[in-house]
Structure formats: structure tokens, C-alpha cells
Regions:
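Bacterial N-terminal signal peptides that target proteins for export
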Residues: 1-8
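C-terminal motif of bacterial Sec signal peptides marking the signal peptidase cleavage site
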Residues: 14-17
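Bacterial signal peptide processing site
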Residues: 19-22
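Extracellular mucin-like PTS domains
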Residues: 26-54
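A short, solvent-exposed beta-edge/loop patch
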Residues: 49-52, 63, 168-247, 252
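Second-shell loop/turn segments in exported
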Residues: 59-61, 121-129, 227-234
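A small/polar (G/S/T-enriched), proline-flanked helix-loop surface module common
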Residues: 81-205
Length: 254
């Protein structure tokens, strides 16, 4: 593989992994906290009244989140599920905290999926205390200040991920971000795109990341589509987003 191709492939995998995974990790639609909310509204229920959260409730919520995740069989032939690695706090977590996104009751993260042409997909599902909190998490995607913060964090993350022994002259330029027009998946959906220019010392190309959040009741499924050189294919992104929305509704009983 040419130096630029290898650099883009490494950056795509790093960008896909920046959402974190593992029990204590966070997703792009949640805030890191040390405690679980004392009261919750069951996923999919109206945001009225509260019920006491018990350990079995949290286990059930986690099982619901896991059931809503994308699976390898949802992707075209040739895609591969990567081994999970734990990331205590992913790039961008501080941005969501600053935006005031509420802590989740439970969440689950699928392994990163990698495909042809230096592409990757990630998926995470979060259950919020109620539908209003989940809606706030989706609406935050439309905040230009939040997107700018995430772009800065992703740029810094990728710069720190470059193997300088292999790519001594490589550069990661400042990322740009814009709102992304997405179909009306689920009860509510929103998206944005981050574009990161890279240079291996002789050639310049772009790394694209499309992030989509879809809500159903008190649950949100978040997808990221990473692609090198050209933006993610819209038809592929749409098909997988619809699959994720359908699975979220089935898992939550919406």
C-alpha cells in the first residue's frame, strides 16, 4: 500500500475507535459519570413519573441496549468486526459534557466494523432516563459549537495516533465540520460530518466521518461512518441507518 493509503487506513481505524468500547466507556451521545441516576423512566416510556433503579433494572437496560446494536451480518460481504479495545474516555467526551447532555442509564457499544476502500462503521446504543433527555442528546448534534469542539478533539486524537516512526512527515490538518442532512429515521434523527485533511509529505487527501443519532423513546442509537478519500456512500449510510432504527424500535418495544 502506498504511504498515503497506509496513513489513511490507519487514520480511518483510529477515527472509528475514538468512540470507545467496554463497560466503562462512553459513547458519542453520553456523558461520563461515576454514578447511575437514582431514578429512571423505563426505556420507551413517556417522560412522566419515575421508578426506582435497581441492579436488575440496569442489567435489563443494558440487555436492551445490546439487543439494539448492529451486527456483522447487517453489513455487506467483505466487512470484518474488529476486536474490542477499552478506551476509558474517548475523544470528544468533554464536548458532550460541555453541551450538557445527560448521563445515560445504560449503554452498549458494538465492535468497530471495517470494510473495503479504507472504510469503517461504529455503532453505540444509549438508554437515557427519559425521552426528553434522549431528545436533548439528539438535538445537541445540531449545535455548531459542539461540532466544532468535536472536530478539534478528533484532530488532536488523530495527530496523537500517527506512528511517527513510519510517517515522519505526515500532517493532520484542522478538521472542518457541517450539519448533515439525514432522513427522518425513528422518532427523531440528526447528523453531522467531520472532514479531516491529511498529508503524507507528498500527497494530500481527506478523511470523512459522518455521525448520525437516531432516537426512539428514551433510547438513542448512534452510528459513525468513516471513509477515506471520498465521503461515505449515501445509499449505504441510509440502508444501515434504517436497519439500526428498526432494531432500536424492536429492542425497546417502541
Amino acid at each position: 500500500m502506498a504511504p498515503l493509503g497506509a496513513l489513511l487506513a490507519a487514520a480511518a481505524l483510529a477515527a472509528a475507535g475514538c468512540g470507545g468500547s467496554g463497560d466503562e466507556a462512553t459513547t458519542v451521545v453520553r456523558t461520563v459519570t461515576e454514578t447511575v441516576p437514582a431514578t429512571t423512566t423505563p426505556a420507551g416510556a413517556a417522560a412522566t413519573g419515575t421508578t426506582e433503579t435497581t441492579a436488575p433494572d440496569r442489567r435489563a437496560a443494558r440487555a436492551t441496549a445490546e439487543a439494539a446494536l448492529l451486527r456483522l451480518e447487517d453489513l455487506p460481504s467483505g466487512w470484518v468486526a474488529q476486536d474490542e479495545t477499552e478506551e476509558p474516555e474517548p475523544a470528544g467526551a468533554a464536548c458532550w459534557r460541555a453541551a450538557g447532555v445527560t448521563a445515560t442509564v445504560a449503554d452498549a457499544v458494538a465492535p468497530s466494523f471495517t470494510g473495503p476502500s479504507m472504510s469503517a462503521v461504529t455503532n453505540a446504543v444509549a438508554l437515557f432516563p427519559d425521552a426528553d433527555a434522549a431528545s436533548a442528546g439528539v438535538k445537541a448534534v445540531g449545535d455548531a459549537k459542539l461540532r466544532a469542539c468535536l472536530a478539534r478533539e478528533l484532530t488532536a486524537f488523530l495527530r496523537g495516533s500517527i506512528d511517527r516512526d513510519r510517517y515522519e512527515e505526515a500532517q493532520v490538518f484542522d478538521a472542518e465540520t457541517a450539519a448533515l442532512s439525514v432522513a427522518p429515521y425513528g422518532a427523531e434523527s440528526a447528523g453531522f460530518r467531520i472532514t479531516v485533511p491529511l498529508d503524507d509529505g507528498t500527497t494530500r487527501a481527506e478523511l470523512y466521518g459522518d455521525w448520525i443519532a437516531i432516537r426512539d423513546g428514551a433510547a438513542v442509537t448512534q452510528l459513525s461512518f468513516i471513509s477515506a478519500i471520498r465521503p461515505p456512500e449515501e445509499a449505504f449510510r441510509d440502508d444501515l441507518s434504517r436497519t439500526a432504527a428498526t432494531r432500536l424500535r424492536a429492542a425497546t418495544g417502541g
